């Protein structure tokens, strides 16, 4: 069983790229994904939706997805995750886009499995327009996700797969420590 942890510079495209690589080798993968993009019928069977909200109904749905993720990994499946939960963004218009702090949910899943962790780093970022709009209003930025997907047509993308991590269970880290450690590993992959 394996858990892929990756940075998230582009949005939907990151997931499409990883899924296209993995599905050439194995079909038993699931992707932990933002609920907003989990409505695509053709791929719904591969998706475990997560909603980043404090509403009771959303928390209940997240618990179900987390349980399914743990069961999937413990059944020797592959789980693909983008632990930041949102696309990398720039704090100032002309600065580099930075990966947000990772959510401890992935640490919780790792602590309940004995999965091999596969760190993946994507290189690149979305357009200046995307980051400029995000600087003005993060909700407006969401409108540009499809544009960002389409404007990358016929481009080549660079990603690197880091050294696999056989287990973190011996280190006795809490969920936050796990994701902080893995984030550091991913953003430092060359």
Name the predicted role of every residue range.
Residues 3-58:
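Catalytic core of membrane glycerolipid acyltransferases/transacylases, capturing the structured
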Residues 2, 27-30, 46, 69, ...:
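Generic beta-strand structural signal
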Residues 1, 12-15, 43-48, 82-86, ...:
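Generic detector of short, locally flexible boundary/turn motifs and exposed helical patches
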Residues 63-190:
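Non-catalytic C-terminal accessory region of glycerolipid acyltransferases
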